[in-house]
Swiss-Prot record:
<dbReference type="GO" id="GO:0005802">
    <property type="term" value="C:trans-Golgi network"/>
</dbReference>
<feature type="binding site">
    <location>
        <begin position="284"/>
        <end position="293"/>
    </location>
    <ligand>
        <name>3'-phosphoadenylyl sulfate</name>
    </ligand>
</feature>
<dbReference type="GO" id="GO:0005796">
    <property type="term" value="C:Golgi lumen"/>
</dbReference>
<dbReference type="GO" id="GO:0060468">
    <property type="term" value="P:prevention of polyspermy"/>
</dbReference>
<feature type="binding site">
    <location>
        <position position="182"/>
    </location>
    <ligand>
        <name>3'-phosphoadenylyl sulfate</name>
    </ligand>
</feature>
<dbReference type="GO" id="GO:0000139">
    <property type="term" value="C:Golgi membrane"/>
</dbReference>
<keyword id="KW-0333">Golgi apparatus</keyword>
<feature type="transmembrane region" description="Helical; Signal-anchor for type II membrane protein">
    <location>
        <begin position="9"/>
        <end position="25"/>
    </location>
</feature>
<dbReference type="GO" id="GO:0007342">
    <property type="term" value="P:fusion of sperm to egg plasma membrane involved in single fertilization"/>
</dbReference>
<feature type="region of interest" description="Interaction with peptide substrate">
    <location>
        <begin position="100"/>
        <end position="104"/>
    </location>
</feature>
<feature type="disulfide bond">
    <location>
        <begin position="224"/>
        <end position="232"/>
    </location>
</feature>
<feature type="glycosylation site" description="N-linked (GlcNAc...) asparagine">
    <location>
        <position position="342"/>
    </location>
</feature>
<dbReference type="GO" id="GO:0006478">
    <property type="term" value="P:peptidyl-tyrosine sulfation"/>
</dbReference>
<keyword id="KW-0808">Transferase</keyword>
<keyword id="KW-0472">Membrane</keyword>
<feature type="disulfide bond">
    <location>
        <begin position="95"/>
        <end position="155"/>
    </location>
</feature>
<dbReference type="InterPro" id="IPR026634">
    <property type="entry name" value="TPST-like"/>
</dbReference>
Length: 376
């Protein structure tokens, strides 16, 4: 018995010595490589790059840079909230509320690239483009994945993220983008009347806001075209409202997601588990609780100053480029589907449900500001 124990101890000792010898040999080789000026970067293993989350249904979800993320964006007041609410109504998709931080971090990354002096300093410090991109990739994925419940398909809605579509497509090669497009006159009227603060936009001036709208949508549209039609789909707000079923079928086909009738009734899933989460501080919340309706389409007509109407084609040339008539007040957007007409009658009669957790907020909000119906 004593002999067998000795043999076991001897075998264990030999094994430990072998392991230590192998590790020591590896360290010697690494030291030689460093001294010789050849340093191979340590790369994360594929399993380390995955983000693992457990859903309320006890299903494990794994997220990584190769997953098909969805990015929804556009100039604010162009229907981005409506679009993401419709996607949130799908049982396999989760967008959630605006993160607000993702477009700011993307803007910082862009600023570092544009500044030659700053880029030189970063490179000297070893903070190369590869290091920054890996950090951005991990940060963005972490924020998108963890700011809401896990789902098979994750989506992000921060309007200005689509100013960086080309960069995001490089970070997440299987991602797809939905660029919300809306008549700039309607978007600007909504910004001004609802007092939606946007950096750089002078809400006291239709001319200034239309000029800034034109610049913003021009950048986003160019990015969308550069990414390519197979990865970025322009979605016209007016057509989404007038023909929701047709538009959503096209959108889901583009995203490679199976059809579900729930996307046509997002208002029924607001505040419900696995449904549509809304923020009390987002300006569109009081509109998106209603079914898709026509109230917001032409509400801008008659409110834009005459001199701005006269100069519209010069102030906002992107209107014509996107297919809008800059001289029509309002343009003929098309004829609505019967369900949308019915929804509009319901909204005018107040025949829709306000989620219990938002009732007090809307009573206060409606007493302090004029009501604006319609989905935006």
């Amino acid at each position: 018995m004593r002999l067998s124990v000795r043999k076991v101890l001897l075998a264990v000792g030999c094994a430990l010595a072998l392991v230590l010898a192998v590790q020591l040999g590896q360290q010697v080789l690494e030291c030689r490589a460093v001294l010789g000026g050849v340093r191979s970067p340590r790369r994360m293993q594929p399993e380390q790059e995955e983000l693992v989350m457990l859903g309320a249904d006890h299903v494990e979800y794994r997220y990584g840079k190769t997953m098909p993320l969805i990015f929804v964006g556009g100039v604010p007041r162009s229907g981005t909230t409506l679009m993401r609410a419709m996607l949130d109504a799908h049982p396999e998709v989760r967008c959630g509320e605006e993160t607000r931080i993702i477009p700011r971090v993307l803007a910082m990354r862009q600023a570092w690239t544009k500044s030659g002096r700053e880029k030189l300093r970063l490179d000297e410090a070893g903070v190369t483009d590869e290091v920054l991109d890996a950090a951005m990739q991990a940060f963005i994925l972490e924020v998108i994945a963890k700011h809401g419940e896990p789902a098979r398909v994750l989506c992000n809605k921060d309007p200005f993220t689509l100013k960086s579509s080309v960069y995001l497509a490089r970070l997440f090669p299987n991602s797809k983008f939905l660029l919300m497009v809306r008549d700039g006159r309607a978007s600007v009227h909504s910004m001004i009347t609802r007092k939606v603060t946007i950096a750089g936009f002078d809400l006291s001036s239709y001319r200034d806001c239309l000029t800034k709208w034109n610049k913003a949508i021009e950048v986003m549209y160019a990015q969308c075209m550069e990414v390519g039609r197979d990865k970025c789909l322009p979605v016209y707000y007016e057509q989404l409202v007038l023909h929701p079923r047709r538009s959503l079928k096209r959108i889901l086909d583009f995203l490679g997601i199976a059809w579900s009738d729930t996307v046509l009734h997002h208002e029924d899933l607001i505040g419900k588990p696995g449904g549509v989460s809304l923020s009390k501080i987002e300006r569109s919340t009081d509109q998106v609780i209603k079914p898709v309706n026509l109230e917001a389409l032409s509400k801008w007509t008659g409110h834009i100053p005459r001199d701005v109407v006269r100069d519209m084609a010069q102030i906002a040339p992107m209107l014509a480029r996107l297919g809008y008539d800059p001289y029509a007040n309002p343009p003929n957007y098309g004829n609505p589907d019967p369900i949308v007409i019915n929804n509009t009658h319901r909204v005018l009669k107040g025949d829709y449900k306000t989620p219990a957790n938002l009732k007090g907020y809307f009573q206060v909000n409606q007493n302090s500001t004029s009501p604006h119906l319609g989905s935006s």
